[in-house]
A protein has these predicted regions:
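Extracytoplasmic/periplasmic substrate-binding proteins
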Residues: 39-45, 50, 55, 150, ...
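Helix-loop-helix "hinge/cap" segment bordering the ligand-binding cleft or interdomain interface
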Residues: 134-207, 225-271, 276, 333-346, ...
């Protein structure tokens, strides 16, 4: 009997060996984290990107991307939150992350010198930390640390100004007169008045993001801004009416693109290559992107950067520029409070790595010898990027590898200067050094009661405002009705919303 018992014990031990090996193997499997983020036309974010594969190998974790195409992105974010089944990391705009602040893991104690030294270098600064914290001072997400300020610029065809002997326009009225000359004097020489003096690609949640900066010349922003410590709402400011009158005049005369609400990047590029566009406004890299459209077609085309036009009081500025921590774009990263501890650790490991010197180089430049080279101490992108064999622009080539993607959370000024032309660097320096970047309004953190007021009243105001601003620009509604529009916004509860914003702004400025 004893012999049988020993034999049975031996057989059981042998039988359990595979299970033991399986358990050990299972313990060694990498932790899987999921990341939800916007998959843009000009910035792909999806599984299979080269940088995602490199990050997985370097960090010993598995990363699964949940791509969210940008169309109706706010609705998709709302549905994601409503489901309660969130991925490990969600990347989105700060104000929307803070709207559901309790969904994100508090980071105050997790960002420290020992466990996350690279994040600590940045977020130990109280000025930086408050930009990513809620009204109670709890740090809720990681933002993108930018390297420059002048991200968006005006640019135009200098060769058309020269051809028509037009002086460089300085004021909004000068610009209107130049637009008229472009429309009437046939600079493309085809005998048809098909020129579009100002054309942009649709941008922003309301699609007019690249048109509305003209109003900055009147010293206002479209929504909230601060003036002498007082929070104001630009869309109902008397100066907004003046700005809209100028924009409506341009639109009515065909000087502003009639398709600004619907024109995508492909259509916008086509308008340029069809020799129709004089001027635009977009991210600085597009100065080169547009210029490159003509490199094998025309030799006399000269795309140059331009400073913002001066308004009636001499203001020449844009306000939708980059800040030290960019919180208004889609790449702020919140870690889901319901993730496992292992997933949270892996998520912090990833975020800390992309904030490191090594991670910053990977996500901004790629790998030396393949994507870039160091020449005389300077980072220079390789021909794979600058003269891409598939015909991609330098920026699009980088992003096809996942370089300069949603996970590029620590930007490097060397990147910003390395892949753009001397012309882009010239005009960016002018914007930054000569006062063409207006004051930015901070992303504010609200208490629960304050957020309730915003949810109840501002959502309706914003919808109505978005509808009416476009109607005023396009002449669907006459500007004689601007005062009626203001009265309606006030009736919807603007005073209560402004009181909430003022309280949050005062807290922020302490």
């Amino acid at each position: 009997m004893k012999h049988f018992s020993r034999l049975l014990a031996l057989l059981l031990a042998v039988a359990l060996l595979p299970l033991t090996f399986m358990a050990a193997a299972s313990a060694e499997e990498p932790v899987t984290i999921t990341i939800w983020g916007s998959d843009r036309e000009n910035m792909p974010f999806r599984n299979g990107l080269w940088t995602i594969d490199v990050l997985q190998e370097k960090l010993g974790i598995k990363i699964e991307i949940i791509s969210a195409p940008t169309e109706n992105l706010a609705e998709k974010y709302g549905l994601l939150i409503a489901s309660g089944d969130l991925p490990t990391i969600v990347q989105y705009k700060a104000k929307d992350l803070l709207l559901y602040k309790d969904a994100w893991t508090p980071l105050n104690d997790l960002i420290n010198e020992t466990d996350t030294p690279n994040l600590w270098k940045v977020y130990s600064d109280p000025e930086i930390r408050r930009k990513v914290s809620d009204a109670d001072g709890i740090m809720r997400f990681i933002g993108q640390r930018t390297a420059i300020t002048a991200g968006k610029l005006y640019f135009w065809r200098q060769d058309w100004l020269d051809k028509l002997n037009l002086a460089t326009p300085k004021t909004t009225e000068d610009l209107y007169n130049v637009f008229k000359a472009i429309k009437e004097c046939d600079p493309n020489g085809n005998g048809v008045a098909d020129e579009i003096p100002f054309a942009v690609r649709k941008n922003g949640s309301n699609n007019r993001g690249n048109v509305i900066p003209f109003i900055n010349a009147w010293g206002i922003a479209e929504t909230f801004f601060a003036e002498d410590g007082q929070v104001k709402f630009g869309a109902t400011d008397p100066r907004m009416k003046e700005a809209l009158e100028w924009m409506n005049r341009c639109y009515a005369e065909g000087l502003i693109d009639q398709e600004y609400l619907t024109r995508d990047k492909t259509s916008w590029y086509s308008a340029w290559t069809n020799n129709q566009v004089f001027m635009s406004y977009d991210w600085s890299a597009y100065i080169d992107n547009v210029g490159n459209l003509f490199k094998d077609v025309e030799t006399d085309i000269n795309i140059v950067g331009a400073v913002p036009p001066e308004g009636p009081t001499g203001i020449s500025e844009t306000r939708d520029q980059l800040q030290p921590i960019t919180v208004d774009e889609d790449w702020n990263a919140g870690i889901f409070v319901g993730a496992t501890e292992e997933q949270k650790k892996a998520a912090l490991k990833l975020l800390d790595y992309v904030y490191s010197e090594e991670g910053m180089i990977l996500m901004n430049f790629g790998v030396e010898g393949q994507h870039f080279n160091i020449v005389d101490g300077e980072y220079k992108y390789s021909d794979l990027i600058m003269n891409n064999p598939d015909g991609l622009s330098p920026q699009d080539a980088l992003r096809s590898f996942g370089i300069q993607s949603m996970l590029t959370l620590l930007q490097d000024a060397r990147y910003e200067r390395a892949f753009v032309s001397d012309e882009v660097n010239r005009i960016r320096d002018i914007y930054e050094q000569e006062g063409h970047i207006g004051p930015a309004f901070p992303t504010l953190a609200f208490t629960n009661d304050e957020q309730s007021v915003i949810n109840e009243k501002y959502t309706e105001i914003e919808t109505y405002m978005n509808e009416m601003v476009d109607k005023f620009i396009m002449g669907v509604e006459p500007l004689d009705k601007f005062d009626e529009y203001v009265a309606q916004v006030e009736k919807m509860g603007l005073a209560d919303v402004l009181a909430v914003y003022q309280a949050a702004y005062d807290r922020y400025m302490k």
